[in-house]
């Protein structure tokens, strides 16, 4: 396993932002209470996006940031607790959406 490296990263977030003030209109809480206990001010909610679409967007950004061609990728590795399907895996869907060689490892 020599020569394996992460040369770039990318990120993608859903468009829908849910603030603590938004939550306070739904449940009995407020921004100060949530922020003091969690440090969280905003969170992101998927409406149109999927785990796969966000992973593809982030992967595309990582490839662009690294300045490498997608054909240089030797594996697709995805870690998530919010996959879109039980099967196929998010990694396999990303592999397909990016047009990567079907022979590379995807998990």
Language-model regions, residue ranges each:
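Short glycine-rich or small-residue beta-strand-to-loop segments that form or flank ligand, phosphate
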Residues: 75-80
